[in-house]
């Protein structure tokens, strides 16, 4: 009986939890809820490119093939890819990027959920992750094109739009 009283008194301290983590998660969610899936993927790719230039250098061809929807993201990606392909050293690239793209870099760091994932990963793991993100981006981009073509077909049915839609859908199914 005495033991029960002791546990009861002690339980009052256990109930007083720190809700700071929950609050931080809510704030992050509020910031990210306005971002589409494709924007989050863009930020994730840019985060890896910005923080792992060696990995980005190995993926120059794949990175130059994709075109981001957001102009500012596309400009940043192009600036980094161009600098890497010209053979500029990391310090020059970082200085150039940090001076011209401060606002977007801050936004990427605030909204990129990939930071925790890459924290303790090897360069090989990060390279694989970048491959997956690029593939996801291409799929999302194709889905967007399909949606837009379907909408176009609904508005006016023409053979060219229909054949392009079929081609895109079959390409998506193959991947």
Language model features by range: what are they?
Residues 1-175:
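A charged alpha-helical hairpin associated with nucleic-acid processing machineries
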């Amino acid at each position: 009986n005495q033991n029960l009283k002791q546990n009861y008194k002690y339980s009052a301290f256990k109930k007083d939890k720190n809700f700071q983590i929950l609050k931080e998660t809510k704030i992050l969610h509020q910031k990210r809820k306005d971002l589409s899936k494709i924007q989050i993927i863009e930020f994730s790719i840019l985060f890896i490119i910005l923080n792992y230039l060696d990995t980005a250098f190995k993926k120059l061809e794949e990175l130059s093939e994709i075109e981001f929807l957001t102009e500012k993201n596309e400009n940043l990606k192009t600036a980094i890819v161009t600098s890497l392909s010209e053979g500029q050293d990391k310090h020059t690239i970082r200085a150039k990027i940090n001076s011209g793209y401060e606002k977007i870099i801050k936004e990427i760091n605030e909204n990129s959920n990939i930071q925790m994932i890459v924290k303790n990963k090897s360069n090989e793991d990060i390279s694989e992750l970048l491959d997956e993100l690029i593939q996801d981006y291409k799929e999302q981009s194709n889905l967007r094109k399909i949606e837009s073509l379907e909408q176009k077909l609904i508005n006016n049915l023409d053979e060219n739009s229909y054949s392009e839609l079929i081609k895109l859908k079959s390409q998506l199914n193959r991947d």
